[in-house]
């Protein structure tokens, strides 16, 4: 996706996969940014594993062991049929980690390359496979153009980070071009758990997988979507763009009750 899908001047800084050996001598594939290892492949390749023996579950994996359903559309549909599922909304896995990259140009290149790959992936079975694009919202005008491009190619859903750059929160009018594009195209914008942009105050998550392990991390992730949704709602975005659709992914649903009570009290 990245080596062949990004501009030539970005390839040296793009995510790349290499073989590594851990302290136990086990060889695996890992993602690198430049010469920095950030995560092993196994972090997002646990599909099909059983939980009867948790000791067998680890993040040490090689590409050859990844199920073809992860990257071949026909194989994905075969696996879905085994589970009695007719179709799927295809979303990035490892790609979501890249929202923590500081280099905005690299992130834009990653999103563009992934979106191109995604269009090819879902186009073979457009009724059964629906793709979710990735948008870098650091430059909202650029994000709006990329969203419109993806819609023209058949994509109707896109991820935006659950927390944007700290100096331009979602209440900032700078995002109006993006909201307008989503409103006019009917696109669903989604905010996925743990997709904060780089260096957001109070967020420990980075591109390195080790930053995902603190015990307090998981039970507090709904804070970010609550903050983002509150910013958007009280900035009047939904009134100014009445057809806009914005959703939450993997934050579960229980968090919404208390904010709804607080919204009522606030007005």
What are these regions (language model features)?
Residues 1-267:
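Helix-coil boundary/capping segments in enzymes
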């Amino acid at each position: 996706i990245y080596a062949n899908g990004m501009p030539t001047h970005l390839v040296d800084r793009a995510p790349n996969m290499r073989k590594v050996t851990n302290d136990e001598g086990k060889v695996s594939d890992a993602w690198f940014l430049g010469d920095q290892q950030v995560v092993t492949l196994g972090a997002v390749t646990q599909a099909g594993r059983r939980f009867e023996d948790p000791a067998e579950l680890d993040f040490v994996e090689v590409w050859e062991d990844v199920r073809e359903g992860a990257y071949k559309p026909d194989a994905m549909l075969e696996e879905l049929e085994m589970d009695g599922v007719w179709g799927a909304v295809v979303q990035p896995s490892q790609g979501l980690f890249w929202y923590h990259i500081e280099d905005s140009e690299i992130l834009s290149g990653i999103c563009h390359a992934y979106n191109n790959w995604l269009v090819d992936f879902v186009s073979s079975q457009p009724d059964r496979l629906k793709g979710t694009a990735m948008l870098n919202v650091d430059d909202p005008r650029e994000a709006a153009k990329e969203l419109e491009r993806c819609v023209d190619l058949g994509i109707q859903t896109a991820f935006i980070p659950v927390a944007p750059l700290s100096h331009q929160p979602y209440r900032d009018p700078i995002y109006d071009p993006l909201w307008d594009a989503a409103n006019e195209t009917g696109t669903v914008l989604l905010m996925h758990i743990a997709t904060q942009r780089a260096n957001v105050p109070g967020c420990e998550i980075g591109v390195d997988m080790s930053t995902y392990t603190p015990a307090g991390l998981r039970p507090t992730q709904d804070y970010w979507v609550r903050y983002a949704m509150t910013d958007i709602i009280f900035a009047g975005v939904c009134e100014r763009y009445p057809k806009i659709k914005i959703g939450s992914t993997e934050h579960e649903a229980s968090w919404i009750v208390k904010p709804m009570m607080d919204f009522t009290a606030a007005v």
